From Swiss-Prot:
Alphabetized PROSITE patterns for the sequence: DIX
Cross-referenced InterPro entries: DIX, DIX_dom_sf, Dsh/Dvl-rel, Ubiquitin-like_domsf
UniProt main location, coarse: other
Biased composition (Basic and acidic residues): 309-322
Biased composition (Polar residues): 339-349
Coiled-coil stretches: 71-240
Organism name: Danio rerio (Zebrafish)
Keyword set, alphabetical order: Cell junction, Coiled coil, Cytoplasm, Developmental protein, Wnt signaling pathway
One GO molecular-function entry: identical protein binding
Chain's gene name: dixdc1a
Free-text comment on this protein's domains from its UniProt entry: The DIX domain mediates self-interaction and interaction with dishevelled and axin1.
Subunit structure: Homomers. Interacts with dishevelled and axin1.
Protein name: Dixin-A
Function: Functions as a positive effector of the Wnt signaling pathway regulating antero-posterior neural patterning.
Amino acid sequence: MGAKQMKCLSSSSPSHTPKEEYIIAKSEDSGELVGNHTEQPQSLEDVVKSSATDPYPGPEHVVKEESSTWEEQLCAQQEQLEKEMQETRKMVSRLQALLLHGSLPEDEQTSTLSFGDTASSEQQLILTRSRLDQSMEESLDLKRELLRYKQEARNLQAVKDALQQRMSVQEDSVLQLKQELLRSSMTREELEGQNVELERKLSERNRLLSEYKKELGQKDRLLQQQQTKLDDALRRISESYHRLSGCENNGYSHMMDTSSAVFQHRMGDELQLVRDALRSLRDSFSGHDPQHHTLDTLEQGVASLVDRLHTSDTKKRPERKGSTRSPGRKANHTDRESWPSTSKIAHSHSSPVLSAAASTKVLYYTDRSLTPFLVNIPKRLGDVTLQDFKAAVDRHGSFRYHFKSLDPEFGTVKEEVFQDDAVIPGWEGKIVAWVEEDHGEGR
């Protein structure tokens, strides 16, 4: 009988139905105490019998409660159910302790159940099997929870890896943005520095421009002064020419020759004055100033004007001599023709008035102007020396002189001449030269 009762207790699981929990709770309220395993089934039967009548009140109690409202009934029932639930939980915990340890929690301090003395080996086996089943179920539950936790851990690890990957991508993006920001800041600083440099250069250019404007105004005033001097010189030349024409018309040939010589001398002085003015004006400009071309053109115009005046005077003089010569002086005709003509008088280097009978054209270039200059030297080609060329060019300072010539071995070359008495080589009946400033470099 005791074995069957123990088997019934061991087969019951820790989880009970609500009806059994209610029965167990009522049995505790009735004051029954479970003392040993043999009396446990009898107490359960008594609880079942008593529970068949206790939960439901009699007719008298129903009549008494008819006077209360349904709300109070619900509140009372709810409180009663809560109490029953608490008692049921306590009973379940006691039953679990009884199945596992063989005694109730309140009996642990007073007495301990020993199945080695009172129970048989079959009961111990049943108890061990029940404990083993419970342990296996708990192990299975733990394994399921472990698998669930592992799956959650794997999911969390995957989420973590994805988040780390996204974080690395975001960090790369942030690093790239920082690099772009650094480059943009460096570019901005560089542009700011360039702007400052450009502003400084602009202010410097503005300052230079204002200075150049001042210098240009001064040079314009100087040019006007030189132009005034040139106009005065040309006017004096014209007046001298008119006076010379008046002297030639009075019939005195001796005074005509004297006036012609005086005219040539004065004309040379006036031209020298003009050339000095142009030289001082040229020195006031820079090396590559475009005003040099204007001054060169002006100088060539004045020289050609004086040359035309001299040519016309040379042509008119024989006619006037023939018209004014008296018959009594025809005997001296041979003597007069043997006199040297004024057109063959050697001129100073300050005058470009040259003889057309025995002269050599000289075309020379300078490093200050792209336009070549043309002068005449009153000597035949082959007799012109470097001294004659310097006198014709009439430029102050240290220069180097190169002349175009034909070399038997190399063909057309530029030949530099150093000595003043050296003969200048020619090219196709004229002299082509280049005049360059000597800056002291070694030759």
